[in-house]
Amino acid sequence: MAKKTERAFSCVGCGYVHPKWLGRCPECGEWNSFEETPSLSSGDVRAVKKASSSPVQAFPLCAVRAQDAQRISCGIAEFDRVLGGGAVRRSAIMIGGEPGIGKSTLLLQIAAACGKSVLYVSGEESPGQIRGRADRLNIPIQNIELLCATRVEDVERVLNTRCPTFVIVDSIQTVFSPEAGAIPMTINQLKYCANELIAWVKERDSVLFFTAHVTKDGNIAGPKVVEHMVDTVISFERNEEDIRFLRALKNRFGSVDELGIFTMGENGLSAVQDTAGFFISTRQGMFPVGSATVPVCEGSRVFMVEIQALTVPAKSSVTRVFSDRIDSARVSRVAAVIEKRVGLKFSDQDIYVNVAGGIRLYEPAVDVALAMALYSARQNTPVKTNAAFIGEVSLSGEIRPVRRLKTRLKTAYGLGFSTIYVPIGVEHDTPPPYTLRVVGTLAQTIAEIFSKAKA
């Protein structure tokens, strides 16, 4: 009697599996994203269990010798910074970004700069296209071997022959195996091929890089299980111009706080050397209405950022917040605190918030500067150019301390910001002609700033 294979349906967006077809995925919320995928029959499951029943032994953790991660420089200091000091041997690194952002350019520059043996596997471009890009970038390619293949078995066969230090796959969505089904780019194909390649580097002192497509929401396409399988997930973002940002979303061997900043030009990606003042403009006198500055921490770096706000009367009974660089929930919360604790009404206004330079801000230390920008926009009164603001705003209107305050102050002073507003409890020797203003509440800060501005 033939074995009965159970039916299963999986979401093409996130990999969620359900025994029945669903119109909307309960995990990621996508509509009409379920496709039927074959699942193992009960006989197959028993066969797998039997095959994997070899004896294993447990051992005490205290008997294991600790090992430091062995890192290899990728040849690009800014990329090494994001990884935590270089790529770790036997690790898998996934880079996600929208089409045309520069993923292939970055990996080709890494392949040329690392000084190690590299196998570059391309499933999207022809050899002539890749050579043309290398010539445009004017990079050395003597250590790079190229393989244009999409079957994972072919890739593994070449890997076993060459044993390169760096393995680059562009992209993982184009690799397939007949063992995982007849249709490429399915959930099963992604999981199977990623697992095969990761298993290969885990057994050797190599490093695996592969690119991944992103969805229209900016999330990495494919099942989340692939992100769990790799050691590092790096997001490749851009602003409206030629600036690129590299940010680690997951890093088993380092911090996820570091930010890499590049500019895209004729010669490819170039690291920004002076990041402290990269996102602000030199001005004299007053800032434009609705602008305020804050020193922001990203990993070991501190740089000044200008927050811009605009308020207009709402055109309907439902007000809206437009902010894609700062979480809109944070903007709404700060506006609500101003309305409650200061008495300035925002509930009848549409709010627009932007960050100059296009960088995304996540830390709470931007709250006070955001509040100053919102108040300035609502009152149509500018803030002094040489003033900067540091602090988190609580729901009670208090200004709370933030981490690495001394480093933030040093950066702000170095860029000519002579008056810094900080939370209560800060002890710092302020060199002349700089002024450190200690404030306890948002209402106190607003009263001091804007009473002087009006005067």
From Swiss-Prot:
Coiled coil: none annotated. GO terms for molecular function: ATP binding; ATP hydrolysis activity; ATP-dependent DNA damage sensor activity; damaged DNA binding; zinc ion binding. Keywords: ATP-binding, DNA damage, DNA repair, DNA-binding, Hydrolase, Metal-binding, Nucleotide-binding, Stress response, Zinc, Zinc-finger. DNA-dependent ATPase involved in processing of recombination intermediates, plays a role in repairing DNA breaks. Stimulates the branch migration of RecA-mediated strand transfer reactions, allowing the 3' invading strand to extend heteroduplex DNA faster. Binds ssDNA in the presence of ADP but not other nucleotides, has ATPase activity that is stimulated by ssDNA and various branched DNA structures, but inhibited by SSB. Does not have RecA's homology-searching function. ATP binds at G97, E98, P99, G100, I101, G102, K103, S104. Its EC number is 3.6.4.-. CDD domains: RadA_SMS_N. A zinc finger (C4-type) spans 11-28. The keyword Disulfide bond does not apply. Residues 350-455 are annotated as: Lon-protease-like. PANTHER family: DNA REPAIR PROTEIN RADA, DNA REPAIR PROTEIN RADA-LIKE PROTEIN. SUPFAM superfamilies: P-loop containing nucleoside triphosphate hydrolases, Ribosomal protein S5 domain 2-like. This is DNA repair protein RadA. HAMAP family: RadA_bact. Belongs to the RecA family. RadA subfamily. PROSITE patterns: RECA_2. Has a putative N-terminal zinc-finger, a middle region with homology to RecA with ATPase motifs including the RadA KNRFG motif, while the C-terminus is homologous to Lon protease. One of its GO terms (biological process) is recombinational repair. InterPro entries: AAA+_ATPase, DNA_repair_RadA, KaiC-like_dom, P-loop_NTPase, RecA_ATP-bd, Ribosomal_Su5_D2-typ_SF, Ribsml_uS5_D2-typ_fold_subgr, Rubredoxin_2.
